[in-house]
């Protein structure tokens, strides 16, 4: 038996623009920082608190205020929830349904956000296991999220493929010893942002263009 692990935001559902806007608004509310869109995409996969620390360190370079971090994380979650539902990328449900292997989701987002989106769009039995940012102590690029998924799938690293859309996710899969492909979808990132972590032939425009690769992998 083989397995495929999917990132959620930007791979399965078109939720990244809402994440980006929520981070921009919440950070601006408590600091004078204007967070660039690409910065969020490049750091996608980090757990929420780790991402805020990265933002403060990158833009201010000063000591991290734990209280401010908690306020930003809470406010970001509030703003994100106001966006309501998110559309699944075209073909995703059909493509995954046709894969005859184990399927998992690994996301740096909170358990509440992940389960709400998955249950709303896929149902609660569509994936064999789901690992969220609340389930682990270290987020991507640390291999822990993927190693936890391997454990829950009862599979070895060489039996699994990861589908990502962010450089940190690709790095995390490599650190876990798992092969990986990228589906860009509507990310502002390009091959230049991935060239240090993954070969060009493993980068696809979207899930539809990766369909044949995924089917061959499962077979």
What are these regions (language model features)?
Residues 26-27, 47-64, 117, 150:
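Helix-loop "lid/cap" segments that line or gate small-molecule binding pockets
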Residues 18, 43-47, 87-91, 109-110, ...:
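Short beta->alpha linker loops
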Residues 12, 88, 103, 162-163:
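Conserved SAM-binding loop
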Residues 56-94:
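Metal-dependent phosphoesterase signature
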Residues 81-105, 111, 115:
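Short, acidic loop-to-helix structural element flanking the phosphoryl-transfer center
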Residues 20, 24, 45-53, 73, ...:
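An amphipathic alpha-helix signature
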Residues 1-2, 110-111, 115-219:
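Asp-based, Mg2+/Mn2+-dependent phosphohydrolase catalytic module
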Residues 1-39, 175:
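Active-site neighborhood of HAD-like aspartate-dependent phosphohydrolases
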């Amino acid at each position: 038996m083989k397995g495929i692990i999917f990132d959620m935001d930007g791979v399965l559902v078109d939720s990244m623009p809402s994440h980006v806007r929520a981070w921009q608004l919440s950070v601006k509310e408590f600091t004078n920082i204007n967070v660039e869109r690409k910065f969020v995409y490049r750091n996608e996969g980090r757990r929420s608190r780790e991402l805020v620390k990265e933002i403060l360190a990158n833009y201010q370079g000063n000591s991290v205020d734990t209280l401010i971090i908690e306020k930003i994380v809470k406010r970001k979650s509030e703003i994100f929830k106001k966006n309501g539902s998110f559309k699944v990328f075209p073909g995703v449900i059909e493509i995954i349904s046709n894969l005859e292997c184990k399927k998992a989701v690994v996301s740096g987002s909170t358990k509440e956000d992940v389960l709400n989106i998955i249950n709303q769009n896929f149902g609660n039995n569509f994936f064999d296991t789901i690992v969220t940012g609340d389930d682990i102590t270290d987020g991507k690029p640390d291999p822990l999220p993927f190693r936890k998924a391997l454990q829950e799938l009862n599979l070895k690293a060489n039996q699994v493929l990861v589908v990502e859309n962010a450089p940190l996710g690709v790095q995390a899969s490599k650190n876990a010893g798992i092969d990986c492909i990228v589906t860009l979808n509507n990310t502002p990132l390009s091959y230049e942002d991935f060239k240090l972590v993954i070969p060009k032939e493993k980068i696809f425009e979207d899930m539809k263009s990766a369909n044949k690769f995924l089917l061959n992998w499962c077979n």
